[in-house]
């Protein structure tokens, strides 16, 4: 097995330039790296990181390596790898198995590659790595496991789990999968749900996805957003962020489709229209899914859309839009721009799908800005340190609040922002039950 496999090693110089730019905008992670270089809290650990291979991820991986870890980096999406960054990291001694445009077989070969290094900590974005490990642990043999074994060789499940101390998960989608695994009684090692940290979801999910989703839509289409009717499926933190930016870009109508009555009510109070997708399909110009669920936009919805409707997905997996159904019924299909395909329906209408229905911000753009990933990946680095220092029972955990607040404090410090502190009198007041009216 080679130490790394990337698309083109000659891209490494350009990748180093990308990493340099990211590091200029990720001061919190660099401060953590400086401490890691001295303390080596990850010494002796092998971290298998299944993440989008971007310049920001590269800064995280360098930080983990500075902490003493041996790092194996594989992609969490077949289309999101930045090949120049992958090449640069491979030259630095990171074990990288990633390139843009992987087939399903190659994608799961990458997971097998990571497992061949016998990881002690897993780091996931969408839970594909963790789910695969659990399939092996529970004796499941499907086609994806066959692909894994092509590069991992024969795996001793008991030995694999005896070495894994714990894992982390970056996304809402991944946390949902892992909590389902826990609920079924099949979770085999502890997981820290990084996505549940305030300094992750309040910033990454809302501001990061809000900006990068529209970056992807505009790069793919070069359309003017002002004056358009925008339909957003899902009003979690990702949907909120997309809606905020749609309004800021001048969308004529921002329509939210939501199944949760509390979130739907919140969307109404935030000033957006709320309606079912059946109705929204008839009036929308641009549709963006952010639900984490299957077929938020069904084939029936697509047939109701205007001629020229644009479809994009901001959720982790390419299941939120019924792409398979669209492929099946379309009478014609052609690529008219990079990452933009035109489908002609039997009724003569045309719809435009961005990035095969995969993550629009990473397929058609570069993902989240470095400044916001500084927070998310600071959480990832500190979660890895927490796992290395603490033996946890099998469960899905939130990162301790003191770590979450420390990330926020460091970010404010690097931004040159000071905050107020409680006086001693105020501390006594809020800790007393006797004082009142």
Curated annotation (Swiss-Prot):
Pathway listed: Amino-acid biosynthesis; L-homocysteine biosynthesis; L-homocysteine from S-adenosyl-L-homocysteine: step 1/1
Residues binding substrate, per UniProt: 54, 125, 170, 200, 204
Annotated binding of NAD(+), by residue: 171-173, 205, 234-239, 258, 293, 314-316, 361
Alphabetized GO MF terms: adenosylhomocysteinase activity
Domain of life: Archaea
A Pfam family hit: AdoHcyase
PROSITE patterns xrefs: ADOHCYASE_1, ADOHCYASE_2
Function: May play a key role in the regulation of the intracellular concentration of adenosylhomocysteine.
NCBIfam families given in the database record: ahcY, PRK05476.2-3
Family statement drawn from the similarity comment of this UniProt entry: Belongs to the adenosylhomocysteinase family.
Matches recorded under InterPro entries: Adenosylhomocyst_ase-like_sf, Adenosylhomocysteinase-like, Ado_hCys_hydrolase_NAD-bd, NAD(P)-bd_dom_sf, S-Ado-L-homoCys_hydrolase_CS
Gene3D superfamilies found in the cross-reference section: Adenosylhomocysteinase-like, NAD(P)-binding Rossmann-like Domain
Enzyme Commission number(s) from the entry: 3.13.2.1
Reaction(s) the record says it catalyses: S-adenosyl-L-homocysteine + H2O = L-homocysteine + adenosine
UniProt-annotated location(s): Cytoplasm
Presence of the UniProt keyword Hydrolase in the record: yes
Record keywords, A-Z: Cytoplasm, Hydrolase, NAD, One-carbon metabolism
GO BP field: L-homocysteine biosynthetic process; one-carbon metabolic process; S-adenosylmethionine cycle
The keyword GTP-binding belongs to this UniProt entry's keyword annotation: no
Main enzyme class: hydrolase
Cofactor note: Binds 1 NAD(+) per subunit.
Known cofactor(s): NAD(+)
Record protein name field: Adenosylhomocysteinase
Gene Ontology cellular component terms for the protein in this record: cytosol
